[in-house]
Every structure is written in structure tokens, then in C-alpha cells.
Amino acid sequence: MSFTTRSTFSTNYRSLGSVQAPSYGARPVSSAASVYAGAGGSGSRISVSRSTSFRGGMGSGGLATGIAGGLAGMGGIQNEKETMQSLNDRLASYLDRVRSLETENRRLESKIREHLEKKGPQVRDWSHYFKIIEDLRAQIFANTVDNARIVLQIDNARLAADDFRVKYETELAMRQSVENDIHGLRKVIDDTNITRLQLETEIEALKEELLFMKKNHEEEVKGLQAQIASSGLTVEVDAPKSQDLAKIMADIRAQYDELARKNREELDKYWSQQIEESTTVVTTQSAEVGAAETTLTELRRTVQSLEIDLDSMRNLKASLENSLREVEARYALQMEQLNGILLHLESELAQTRAEGQRQAQEYEALLNIKVKLEAEIATYRRLLEDGEDFNLGDALDSSNSMQTIQKTTTRRIVDGKVVSETNDTKVLRH
């Protein structure tokens, strides 16, 4: 980091003939200051420029007025020698004063240089924090994208679970319908069994009735034969041969047996077919129900795993949010600290600028005094060199001419140290 401090001082005074006398009135002409700082703390430059003009006539306490009054009152060479002696004494005192002021000026310049070296404006480099901030922002963005992707996966899993739930409900309804059909078929089987039992009961009753009728017929035949035998009569009846009741009963019995057998076979065949169909349907439905139960179990496991994943993702999201809040709070605190440091540095910089301006003003005042003394010394030296040829009236007549001495001091400061200093003095005539 480098600073360039430039101070420009200009002093105007009127000339007295061939000698220079300082003017005691002062009027600041211009004062300008500029500050430039590059990004990152490099290439910073502070430039201070001041220009002060002093102009005016000789006051009642000035040197020219004293000389004019002394010479006008005396008018003799003796008085001029006494005046020159007093001027020599004053010159010696002025030289001592100039030497002391130069010493004080060097001391002030050394203090200014030390102050600039110690409390030079410094700007810390925060560029390495920018990389960390960018990395954290990239991580936050990646975590946000991951959270969005996880939320999308959760939504897809929820939709898939809803589809499986609909399929499960459909299969459950089909299973209930099949179970209802099976229950109805079981009722039909029960009714058929009851009908079969009723028919078997009727067959048994018919068999008993047939046996009873056969027994009665045999008893009647035996009774008739006994009556015929006891009467001793031979009765010949020219009549057709009577039918054999036993044969008829046997035929009837055979017919009933055949009918019962056919009915039994038909019923057995029908109910066997119905039972086979029902068994096939039940087997098919049982297989479908088993598959549906297997699918339901898998869906339940999938839902449980998805719920576990959802809980883990929620926990991960909560932890990431907590981490994000902690990072934001930590970096907010660091930013506050950095802002505080920046404000402190700006305050120190403002104080340094104010101190520099104050010291520059003091230096300017001392420089003005030095210029005045140098002008008076030049005047005294000219008086001593000219001797009796000095004409105060000519000096007063030429007092309208004015010269400006402009002194520019440029200092280059790198990392709080003065690496170069240049002084430039210009004399401008008006």
C-alpha cells in the first residue's frame, strides 16, 4: 500500500528596488486536498496541495517604514552608520532566529515522518475471505439443490405410495367380492346338501313303504291260500293270468333305484363341477389375494423405508438449516467485527489526516516566517552591500512589483514508510 503526500506552499511578497522585503498581510489563495484509494488497498494515494499568497504594503511596524523614518530624520552619514549598526544587530538576531526556526522545522519534519511511519493509513486485505465466502455460498447453493432434489424424490415416492394404495384398495375390493362369492357358493353347497339329505330321506321312506306293502301282500296271499285250502273247493276261473305283484314291485323298486341313482349321479356331478369351479375360483382368488398381500407387504415396507428416508431427510434438512443459520450468524458477527475495524481504521485515518493538516498548517506558518526572515536577511545583506548608494525612495517606488515563491514537497509512503521525498521551489514574478 502506498501513499503520496504532496504539500505546496507559495508566498508572495513585494520587492523593494533590488532587494526583497516580506509582506505582513496574508491572504490564502487556494487550498485543495484529494484522496484516492485503489481496490484491495494497493495503489492508494493521498495528495494535499496548498497555495498561500501574502501580499500587502509595509505596515507601521515594518522594516521599510522604520528605515524610511530613520533615514529621513537623520539626513547624515553618522546617522546612517548608526542605523546600519542597529541593522547589523537586528540581522544577527534574525540569523539566530532563522537558525532556531530551521532546527525547529527539521524537528517537525522528523516528527511528521515518524508519525506517518507509525500511524500511516493501513488497509487490511480481505480478499482471502472472499474465497471462503464464495465456497460457503457454493455449498449453500449445492445443499439447496440437494434439498430440492430430495423434496422432489419424496413427492415422487408419495405419489408412488398413493398409486400403490389405490391398487391395494382395488385388490382388496376384488378380494372381498371373491370372498362374498365363495360365501354364496358355500350357501348353495349347503342348500344342495340339505336337498340331497331330504331326497335320501324320501328314498328311505319309500323303501320302507315298499317293504311294508310287500309284507302285506305276502300276508294277504298266504291268507287267501289258506282259505282256499280249508274250503276244499277247486275253483277254476277262466280269467287271464294275474300279474306278479312282486315283479311289479321289483320293477318299481328298480325304477326308483335307477331314478335315485341318476339323480344322485347328476347331483354328484353337478355339485362336483360346482365345487371344482368354486375351488378353482377360490384357488385363483387365493393366489391373487396372496399376490396382493405380497404386494401390500412390499408396499408397506416401501412406505416404511420412504418414511424413514423422509425422516432422515427432514433431520438432514433441519441440521443443514441449523448449520446455515450458524454460518450466517458467525459471518454476520465477523462482518460486524470487520465493519467495526473498518470504522476504527477510518477514524484513525481521519485523525491522521487532521493531524497531517494541522502539522502542514504549522509547517506552512513556519515556512512563511522563514520566507519573511530570508527576505529581511536579503534586504539587510543588500543594504550592507550597497552602503551609501542605497536609496529608500527607489525601494519604496518599486514596491509595487510582487514575487511568489512556491515550494512543493512530495512524499511517497509505502506500507506506512516514507520511501522518497522531493522538494521543488519555484519563484513566480507578478
Curated annotation (Swiss-Prot):
<dbReference type="GO" id="GO:0005198">
    <property type="term" value="F:structural molecule activity"/>
</dbReference>
<dbReference type="GO" id="GO:0005730">
    <property type="term" value="C:nucleolus"/>
</dbReference>
<dbReference type="GO" id="GO:0043066">
    <property type="term" value="P:negative regulation of apoptotic process"/>
</dbReference>
<feature type="modified residue" description="Phosphoserine; by CDK1">
    <location>
        <position position="34"/>
    </location>
</feature>
<feature type="modified residue" description="Omega-N-methylarginine">
    <location>
        <position position="55"/>
    </location>
</feature>
<dbReference type="GO" id="GO:0003723">
    <property type="term" value="F:RNA binding"/>
</dbReference>
<feature type="modified residue" description="Phosphoserine">
    <location>
        <position position="319"/>
    </location>
</feature>
<feature type="modified residue" description="Phosphoserine">
    <location>
        <position position="399"/>
    </location>
</feature>
<feature type="modified residue" description="Phosphoserine">
    <location>
        <position position="18"/>
    </location>
</feature>
<dbReference type="GO" id="GO:0005829">
    <property type="term" value="C:cytosol"/>
</dbReference>
<keyword id="KW-0007">Acetylation</keyword>
<feature type="region of interest" description="Linker 12">
    <location>
        <begin position="225"/>
        <end position="248"/>
    </location>
</feature>
<feature type="modified residue" description="N-acetylserine">
    <location>
        <position position="2"/>
    </location>
</feature>
<dbReference type="InterPro" id="IPR039008">
    <property type="entry name" value="IF_rod_dom"/>
</dbReference>
<feature type="modified residue" description="Phosphoserine">
    <location>
        <position position="42"/>
    </location>
</feature>
<feature type="modified residue" description="Phosphotyrosine">
    <location>
        <position position="36"/>
    </location>
</feature>
<keyword id="KW-0539">Nucleus</keyword>
<keyword id="KW-0325">Glycoprotein</keyword>
<feature type="modified residue" description="Phosphoserine; by CAMK, PKC/PRKCE and AURKA">
    <location>
        <position position="53"/>
    </location>
</feature>
<feature type="cross-link" description="Glycyl lysine isopeptide (Lys-Gly) (interchain with G-Cter in SUMO2)">
    <location>
        <position position="247"/>
    </location>
</feature>
<feature type="region of interest" description="Coil 1A">
    <location>
        <begin position="80"/>
        <end position="115"/>
    </location>
</feature>
<feature type="cross-link" description="Glycyl lysine isopeptide (Lys-Gly) (interchain with G-Cter in SUMO2); alternate">
    <location>
        <position position="426"/>
    </location>
</feature>
<comment type="subunit">
    <text>(Microbial infection) Interacts with hepatitis C virus/HCV core protein.</text>
</comment>
<dbReference type="InterPro" id="IPR018039">
    <property type="entry name" value="IF_conserved"/>
</dbReference>
<feature type="region of interest" description="Necessary for interaction with PNN">
    <location>
        <begin position="70"/>
        <end position="373"/>
    </location>
</feature>
<dbReference type="GO" id="GO:0097110">
    <property type="term" value="F:scaffold protein binding"/>
</dbReference>
<dbReference type="GO" id="GO:0097284">
    <property type="term" value="P:hepatocyte apoptotic process"/>
</dbReference>
<dbReference type="GO" id="GO:0070062">
    <property type="term" value="C:extracellular exosome"/>
</dbReference>
<comment type="similarity">
    <text>Belongs to the intermediate filament family.</text>
</comment>
<feature type="modified residue" description="Phosphoserine; by MAPKAPK2 and MAPKAPK3">
    <location>
        <position position="51"/>
    </location>
</feature>
<feature type="modified residue" description="Phosphoserine">
    <location>
        <position position="60"/>
    </location>
</feature>
<feature type="modified residue" description="Phosphoserine">
    <location>
        <position position="177"/>
    </location>
</feature>
<dbReference type="GO" id="GO:0045095">
    <property type="term" value="C:keratin filament"/>
</dbReference>
<keyword id="KW-0597">Phosphoprotein</keyword>
<feature type="modified residue" description="Phosphoserine">
    <location>
        <position position="100"/>
    </location>
</feature>
<dbReference type="GO" id="GO:0005912">
    <property type="term" value="C:adherens junction"/>
</dbReference>
<feature type="modified residue" description="Phosphoserine; alternate">
    <location>
        <position position="31"/>
    </location>
</feature>
<feature type="region of interest" description="Head">
    <location>
        <begin position="2"/>
        <end position="79"/>
    </location>
</feature>
<keyword id="KW-0963">Cytoplasm</keyword>
<feature type="region of interest" description="Tail">
    <location>
        <begin position="388"/>
        <end position="430"/>
    </location>
</feature>
<dbReference type="GO" id="GO:0005856">
    <property type="term" value="C:cytoskeleton"/>
</dbReference>
<dbReference type="GO" id="GO:0098641">
    <property type="term" value="F:cadherin binding involved in cell-cell adhesion"/>
</dbReference>
